[in-house]
């Protein structure tokens, strides 16, 4: 059985439909690694992230959160408000992947500011990301793992940094040198290991809990 430093109590039936969305009422996490929640669309990944954020707020634990839909609107509104029309035009005319990568770059800046200011004296800090792979090519996801996740762990080794990602891209499940990645079945909380893309594809297409 896996041992985790932080164990969260999970609402198994968040929508009160009389049918459990999750098969576990506990979900464990470890700092110093990227936890990737895996499962097909509709399996509860975003709802699990909502559970996590609820726990963090109730325990006054500092965190930053990325949501693709919200970030896209926020970036455009911010650019217009600041009369940064070049950025606004870029966002409106760019592809989905280009827009997402632009948003993640801005999110990375906010994360760095939070770590060195708002959470400067905090031992524990969480980074929550939902649908950050939307429209991104493999090289951009690798860049996020290298330039954001890995850099954060190296920049503040004294902190317990938790990174939790909900994604559909296989590339997020692949560890890279110096960056441990653990995949977890969002419904059961159990660790899942994928040998290759075909293994991941088969697991998603035959998801027994869906």
Give names to the regions the model predicted.
Residues 34-36, 124-126, 162-164:
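Residue-level preference for the first positions of well-ordered beta-strands
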Residues 32-106, 187-190:
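ABC ATPase nucleotide-binding domain signature region
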Residues 101-120:
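Conserved alpha-helical scaffold flanking the Walker A/P-loop in AAA+ ATPase domains
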Residues 67-87, 143-210:
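C-terminal lobe/lid and adjacent interdomain/linker elements of RecA-like ASCE P-loop ATPase modules
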Residues 120-139:
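Conserved P-loop NTPase "ATPase switch" module shared by AAA+ and STAND
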Residues 42-43, 71, 133-135, 170-172:
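Short, solvent-exposed loop/turn segments at secondary-structure junctions
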Residues 1-26:
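N-terminal pre-Walker A segment at the start of P-loop NTPase domains
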Residues 25-32, 119-122, 155-157:
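Phosphate-binding P-loop
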């Amino acid at each position: 059985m896996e041992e985790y430093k932080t164990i969260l109590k999970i609402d198994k039936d968040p929508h009160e439909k009389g049918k459990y969305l999750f098969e576990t009422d506990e979900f464990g996490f470890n700092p110093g690694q990227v936890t990737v929640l895996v499962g097909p669309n509709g399996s509860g990944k975003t709802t699990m992230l909502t559970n996590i954020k609820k726990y963090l707020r109730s325990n006054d634990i500092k965190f930053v959160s990325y949501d693709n839909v919200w970030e896209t609107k926020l970036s455009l509104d911010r650019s217009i408000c600041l009369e940064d029309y070049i950025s606004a035009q870029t966002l409106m005319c760019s592809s989905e992947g280009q827009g997402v990568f632009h948003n993640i770059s801005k999110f990375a800046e906010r994360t760095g500011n939070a770590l060195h200011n708002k959470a400067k004296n905090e031992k524990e800090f969480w980074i929550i990301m939902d649908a950050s792979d939307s429209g991104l090519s493999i090289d951009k996801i690798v860049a996020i793992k290298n330039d954001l996740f890995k850099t954060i762990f190296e920049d503040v080794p004294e902190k317990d940094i938790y990174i939790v990602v909900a994604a559909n891209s296989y590339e997020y499940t692949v560890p890279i040198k110096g960056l441990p990645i653990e995949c977890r079945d969002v419904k059961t909380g159990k660790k899942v290991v994928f040998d290759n893309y075909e293994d991941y594809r088969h697991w998603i297409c035959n998801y027994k809990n869906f």
